[in-house]
UniProtKB/Swiss-Prot annotation:
Annotated protein name in UniProt: ATP synthase subunit delta
Keyword annotations from UniProtKB, A to Z: ATP synthesis, Cell inner membrane, Cell membrane, CF(1), Hydrogen ion transport, Ion transport, Membrane, Transport
Topology with respect to the bilayer: Peripheral membrane protein
Annotated organism of origin: Sulfurihydrogenibium azorense (strain DSM 15241 / OCM 825 / Az-Fu1)
Family, similarity comment: Belongs to the ATPase delta chain family.
Length: 182
């Protein structure tokens, strides 16, 4: 079943509007939506209850209500989830977390970034990378750092739609492609 992107965007914008500028509420909601989305993707029973036309609306709302209570989702946000279930568009739950995070980042002019290196990186170098990219992109970047030994050396830096791959692995792949052209 295809996700209705217009409906998804409407729900996300409504959530952000009712939550306002409260960064803590937005962050907690984002985390709860991550868990809800993961539950939807991984638990076929939950997904079947939400999507099944044979399950009554009352049963769907009861099941969703129990889950939302466990996730400590703000009261203001719950009606939007129930609206999706009522309109038979419960499948938006699988993409709700990404769309919500994207709109929150846009709202606060922040971007999630990732630095992947072959070896540990010190804070000083990370801050230099962050400063350069923030000036280039014009937004605040929140980095997560990962290690991947398969890179051999160098780094892969991702921030929003910006990707910079300076890894030795990538260099070797490019070299291989250029040598096999002849």
């Amino acid at each position: 079943m295809k996700v209705d992107k217009k409906f998804l965007k409407k729900v996300v914008k409504g959530m952000i509007k009712v939550l306002g500028n409260d960064e803590e509420k937005l962050s907690n909601t984002s985390k709860a939506l991550d868990i809800l989305s993961l539950l939807y993707k991984s638990n076929s029973n939950f997904r079947n209850i939400i999507l099944s036309p044979t399950v009554s609306l009352e049963e769907k709302e009861k099941a969703v209500s129990k889950i939302l209570d466990v996730l400590n989702l703000p009261q203001e946000v719950k009606p939007f989830i129930f609206l999706a279930v009522k309109e038979n568009k419960g499948n938006i739950i699988k993409e709700l977390n990404k769309a919500f995070r994207f709109e929150v980042e846009k709202f606060f002019a922040t971007v999630q970034g990732e630095v992947i290196t072959a070896h540990p990186i010190d804070e000083d170098l990370l801050n230099q990378i962050k400063t350069v990219l923030e000036s280039k992109i014009g937004k605040k970047i929140e980095f997560t750092v990962k290690e991947d030994k398969s890179l051999i050396g160098g780094a892969v830096i991702k921030a929003g739609s910006y990707i910079l791959d300076t890894s030795v692995r990538n260099y070797l792949k490019q070299l291989e492609r250029s040598l096999t052209r002849f």
